[in-house]
């Protein structure tokens, strides 16, 4: 996954003051943008070492393996970095859907509220409520 | 560009504590992710009213029309919002290239430093140094 030919230097990602970098998850095949999330260094390192997308949840303040609850894992084929080295793309194979709402992509609505995305599952079936 | 059919409600974007929202500029045709930048409310409003991508520069602390210096404008066809309403996609027609380095996309390198993108112009020719 990370071939080195000796002529290139690993890019050092610039994490922000909270230690995070925004990550765009993009479907490797359809090129749809699936989600925007954040990663800390540990999440990027785990993504590289395991080949599966890891993020850092800002609301739960914890490292997060995408799909750990739903099973909707993201297999990461490549990591791209932008010119400023402060934003990242994970090029992924997405199992089922990226969004917890059941849509394939989190970006399933236009600004006017109309729906442009495709729903892949019923979240009530996937994220079981505790009884 | 923003048809309303009466059954949908305009989404209210959640700007962060700095008044910004991350914006992914995606090529409408190739679906390449071109750049990740930030917008404040004024930038989103101007994008909607003019049809051209506007952002807010965090380094220069000012509103910024993409291409105002280089001429590499982004005509915005659609604005998508994510499930949490705190991230946005501009679906654009990109003139020439998005990146100030001359590459079509700002995400022209892999994490290992190898180049995957295509260079479209020489930045020294486009961003003239003052003499």
Swiss-Prot record, chains A, B:
InterPro entries: PRA-CH, PRib_AMP_CycHydrolase_dom, PRib_AMP_CycHydrolase_sf. Binds 1 Mg(2+) ion per subunit. This is Phosphoribosyl-AMP cyclohydrolase. Keywords: Amino-acid biosynthesis, Cytoplasm, Histidine biosynthesis, Hydrolase, Magnesium, Metal-binding, Zinc. Mg(2+) binds at residues 82, 84, 86. It is found in: Cytoplasm. Pfam families: PRA-CH (PF01502). Catalyzes the hydrolysis of the adenine ring of phosphoribosyl-AMP. Pathway: Amino-acid biosynthesis; L-histidine biosynthesis; L-histidine from 5-phospho-alpha-D-ribose 1-diphosphate: step 3/9. Its EC number is 3.5.4.19. Its main location: cytoplasm. It comes from the Archaea. The gene is hisI. PANTHER family: HISTIDINE BIOSYNTHESIS BIFUNCTIONAL PROTEIN, HISTIDINE BIOSYNTHESIS BIFUNCTIONAL PROTEIN HIS7.
């Amino acid at each position: 996954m990370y071939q080195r030919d000796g002529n290139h230097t690993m890019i050092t990602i610039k994490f922000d003051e909270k230690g995070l970098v925004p990550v765009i998850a993009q479907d490797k095949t359809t090129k749809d943008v699936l989600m925007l999330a954040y990663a800390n260094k540990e999440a990027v390192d785990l993504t590289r070492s395991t080949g599966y997308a890891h993020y850092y949840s800002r609301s739960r303040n914890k490292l997060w393996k995408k799909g750990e609850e739903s099973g909707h894992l993201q297999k990461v084929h490549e990591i791209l970095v932008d010119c400023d080295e402060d934003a990242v793309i994970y090029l992924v194979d997405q199992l089922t859907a990226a969004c917890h709402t059941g849509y394939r992509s989190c970006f399933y609505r236009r600004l006017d509220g109309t729906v442009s995305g495709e729903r892949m599952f019923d979240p009530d079936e996937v994220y079981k409520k505790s009884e």
